[in-house]
From Swiss-Prot:
Protein name: Chaperone protein HscA homolog
Gene Ontology molecular function: ATP binding; ATP hydrolysis activity; ATP-dependent protein folding chaperone; unfolded protein binding
Underlying gene: hscA
PANTHER family attached to this UniProt entry: HEAT SHOCK PROTEIN 70KDA
One Pfam family recorded for the sequence: HSP70
Length: 620
């Protein structure tokens, strides 16, 4: 994710005020907002010092309650208290009803089949509910940072489809907030640990949240995160640990027929017990019944481990499957990043370490790591220059192009073009019967490939064996909002294509860019001269090759004297082309062209004569 903010050579990077931007982890269970301040990245607390906001929204006749206040009423008013709305994002009502889980809400259906929650304030959709969760986070950020936000980065699960991603953007749009980027949660976690600027290799993101488990296997290559495989269980999370504890308590206390209020009370106590056992060998569980009876029991860590062992084992099985899908082994995994509050459970950390063979990264609060990564990315994208190697690129700092015959650079995307951008150009074959074409993608402002930065090489095969110049290959350069360049070459008649991805900004510093730009200005006149020479040399080679083929086929159309003159001129062109006088090469080519015009006319006449031989006027 390394991006670049550049200035013209000789100028300082334009000084500007620190722009305000935040990263938001819009979670299933809890949501957080984080920002970079004075070079330090941290989540922002509310007035009570709470960093996480429960992702819960309650609708009453007069108000909308969000977070802890809504959570207090969830047991008494479950029908109007919407929890885990993220699970409804981008899903149809039919999908929700077809699932195994039942919900206490009253649903209606929108015209396009999406779910609507029926509340005392009317029907609301998941996007509107999500906007209510975002609202206090945005307000908290603006109050803490002391100004209006220029934009936000919101994290989403890697498996979110287009509809779910668009729904997340729409939620922010309802509040008038600019979304700088939607960032995959695994990538955000990796960024938080600075893994995007470290060695290349495979990274595992083990994300055990309240309601879901996700395992993502990423490959970091030249600053680009590639998702190799994802897996997990959308119905397995810390909540399941709580339910097992609740069932254990009910069994010990011999509680059978319980109402929804007692059930919610037991669940809240189960969560507290789970959290206490993170650091303690045992803890006391306590519940007060409606008649005032106080129930207590001691729950040990060993008992809790036994309860959840099967579920933790299930997550490890998912890790094993996902690694197999990715085609990598545990030995190839450089780091394992722990995400989600449930990864605090000691048994989880022990099992993950045992499986991957190395201690997982846990130094950043697993509840906050995704928001922190999003904040780092937001600070980059909004235009701030943090004290790190991560710099902003919202324009192309150096032109992107392709090598053509003679070692010349054909620029496809010019520098200072804003991104995202797509540009296409057509190229053709140089030789008769050419069935493949090698592409060399370069970066820089100079005219010759030797003076530019090599980015990538790839080959297009399967080009029809046509005459030189007859095949048409369309080359498309596409740079996305993350600065990732995709180059695709397609032969138009067959549709055969090949492509490659590369990060143009990877490994480039401001100084290197400035040097490359200064060199392009310093050597501009020389470069143009060298380009003109190379172009004439390529043209000379093309003309000579074409003429050699024509003479081999139709040389009998010339008498000995004519053939001798043409051969002599061809030798002269070859000799002049070996020199460094572009004008002389051009004149030699023009002389050869004049000398062979009569030969070209005879070839045309002969071709027509052969084509029409034996045919009558009526058949033509």
């Amino acid at each position: 994710m390394a991006l670049l903010q550049i200035a013209e050579p000789g100028q300082s990077a334009a000084p500007h005020q620190h722009r305000l931007a935040v990263g938001i982890d819009l979670g299933t269970t809890n949501s957080l907002v984080a920002a970079v301040r004075s070079g330090e990245t941290a989540t922002l607390p509310d007035e009570l010092g709470q960093h996480s906001l429960p992702s819960i929204v309650r609708y009453t006749q007069d108000s909308v309650e969000v977070g802890a206040l809504a959570a207090l009423s969830s047991a008494q008013d479950p029908q109007n208290t919407i929890v885990s709305v993220k699970r409804f994002m981008g899903r149809s009502l039919a999908d929700i009803k077809a699932g195994e889980q039942s919900f206490p809400y009253e649903f209606a259906e929108s015209e396009n089949g999406l779910p609507l929650f029926v509340t005392p304030q009317g029907q609301v959709n998941p996007v509107q509910v999500s906007a209510e969760i975002l609202r206090p986070l945005i307000a908290r950020a603006e109050k803490t940072l002391g100004g209006e936000l220029q934009g936000v980065v919101i994290t989403v699960p890697a498996y979110f489809d287009d509809a779910q991603r668009q729904g997340t953007k729409d939620a922010a749009a309802l509040l008038g907030v600019k979304v700088l980027r939607l960032l995959n949660e695994p990538t955000a976690a990796a960024i938080a640990y600075g893994l995007d600027s470290k060695q290349e290799g495979v990274i595992a993101i083990y994300d055990l949240g309240g309601g879901t488990f996700d395992i993502s296997i990423l490959r970091l290559n030249r600053g680009v995160f590639e998702v190799l495989a994802t897996g997990g269980d959308s119905a397995l999370g810390g909540d399941d640990f709580d339910h097992l504890l609740q069932a254990h308590m009910q069994q010990v206390w011999q509680l059978s027929d319980i109402d929804s209020q007692l059930s919610r009370q037991l669940l809240i106590e189960s969560r507290r017990v789970k959290e206490a056992l993170t650091d303690a060998a045992e803890t006391e569980a306590k519940v007060i019944l409606a008649d005032g009876t106080e129930l207590t029991q001691i729950v040990s860590k060993a008992e809790f481990d036994a309860m959840i062992a099967a579920l933790v084992k299930k997550t490890i099985a998912s890790c094993r499957r996902t690694l197999r899908d990715a085609g990598v082994t545990t030995d190839e995994v450089l780091e394992t990043v722990m995400v989600g509050g449930s990864t605090r459970v000691p048994l989880v950390r022990e099992q993950v370490e045992a499986f991957f063979g190395k201690p997982p990264l846990t130094s950043i609060d697993p509840d906050r790591v995704v928001a922190i990564g999003a904040a780092i990315q937001a600070d980059i994208l909004v235009g701030n220059k943090p004290e790190s190697d991560l710099l902003l690129l919202d324009v192309i700092p150096l032109s992107l192009g392709i090598e053509t015959m003679g070692g010349l650079v054909e620029k496809v995307v010019s520098r200072n073009t804003t991104i995202p951008v797509a540009r296409a150009q057509e190229f053709t074959t140089f030789k008769d019967g050419q069935t493949a074409m090698a592409f060399h993608v370069v970066q820089g402002e100079r005219e010759l490939v030797a003076d530019c930065r090599s980015l990538a090489r790839f080959t297009l095969k399967g080009i029809p064996p046509l005459a030189a110049g007859a095949a048409h290959i369309r080359v498309t350069f596409q740079v996305d909002a993350d600065g990732l360049l995709s180059v695709t070459a397609m032969e138009k008649s067959t549709g055969v294509q090949s492509s490659i991805q590369v990060k143009p900004s990877f490994g480039l510093s401001d100084t290197e860019i400035a040097t490359m730009l200064k060199d392009s200005m310093k050597y501009a006149k020389d470069d143009i001269g060298r380009r003109m020479l190379a172009e004439q040399q390529v043209e000379a080679a093309r003309v000579l090759e074409s003429l050699h083929a024509a003479l081999a086929k139709d040389g009998d159309l010339l008498n000995a004297d004519e053939r001798g003159q043409i051969d002599a001129t061809m030798v002269n062109v070859a000799q002049v082309a070996a020199g460094d006088d572009a004008d002389a090469i051009k004149l030699a080519i023009e002389k050869l062209d004049e000398q062979t015009q009569d030969f070209a006319a005879r070839r045309m006449d002969n071709s027509i004569r052969v084509a029409f031989k034996g045919q009558s006027i009526d058949n033509i």
